[in-house]
Curated annotation (Swiss-Prot):
Molecular function as annotated in GO: glutaminase activity; imidazoleglycerol-phosphate synthase activity; lyase activity
Protein name as it appears in the record: Imidazole glycerol phosphate synthase subunit HisH
Active site positions: C81 (nucleophile), H196, E198
UniProt xrefs under Gene3D superfamilies: 3.40.50.880
Keyword presence, Cytoplasm: yes
Keyword Amino-acid biosynthesis: yes
EC id: 4.3.2.10, 3.5.1.2
Subcellular location(s) of the protein: Cytoplasm
Main location per the UniProt record: cytoplasm
Subunit architecture: Heterodimer of HisH and HisF.
GO cellular component term, pick one: cytoplasm
Length: 215
């Protein structure tokens, strides 16, 4: 049976993700144990709250090391919501910069919109040949966030002894207010979504099925 760990570091709607994966036949564990998180077929990194607080919580339980070690070994990782944001190099909240995991080049900033947070269902500009969004390219997904990454830059992952240069980088986008932001990111074993697939009905279930098929 396919196994997955939903990483439990104190931030995120973990129970809903555990249920969503279990309902798709995945043997799912909620834990922050390093060995279990490293050895599972898939790792989900959720996240809700402030970028800096999530990074602090992640580091307290060696979550950053788990992510680096899995990506280095080619083992799939899925970041969701702030779990996507922390994969970027930096986050800017309330005028303060915080360092992220750094596997995606760029920074996370406040959305430029009259109403924040961006909350509700929205469509996505799907990247060509997207694996995650295959079959649900024109569907709507559920978002709830105030910050996002507005661009993707080249990331120097060599400092982590990680080389993803042989893998295509696929970026899907969403627009809200005056911002066009990263809605989904795929690069080798690293996948991430700004929206919540576990709260996105049938389309979200199909996305999770697509990810599970890569494990």
């Amino acid at each position: 049976m396919t196994t997955a760990v939903v990483f439990d570091y104190g931030f995120g709607n973990v129970r809903s993700m555990v249920r969503a994966l279990a309902n798709l036949g995945v043997d799912t564990t909620l834990t922050s144990d390093y060995r279990q998180s490293l050895e599972a077929d898939g790792l989900v990194v959720p996240g809700v709250g402030a970028f800096a607080a999530c990074m602090e919580g992640l580091k307290k339980v060696d979550g950053d090391r788990v992510i680096y070690d899995r990506i280095r070994a080619g083992r799939p990782v899925l970041g969701v919501c702030v779990g996507e944001q922390i994969m970027f190099e930096h986050g800017l909240e309330h005028g303060a910069h915080a360092a992220g995991i750094g596997l995606i080049g760029g920074s996370v900033n406040l959305l430029d919109a009259d109403v924040v947070p961006h909350m509700g269902w929205d469509t996505i500009e799907t990247a060509p040949d997207s694996v995650l969004l295959n079959g649900v390219e024109n569907e709507r997904f559920y978002f709830v966030h105030s910050y996002a990454a507005m661009e993707v830059k080249p990331a120097d992952t060599s400092r982590f002894d990680i080389d993803l240069s042989d893998s295509p980088e696929r970026v899907s986008w969403c627009s809200y207010g005056r911002s066009r932001f990263v809605a989904a990111y795929e690069h080798g074993p690293l996948s991430a979504t700004q929206f919540h697939p576990e709260k996105s009905g049938d389309a979200g279930s199909q996305l999770l099925k697509n990810w599970i098929a890569t494990l």
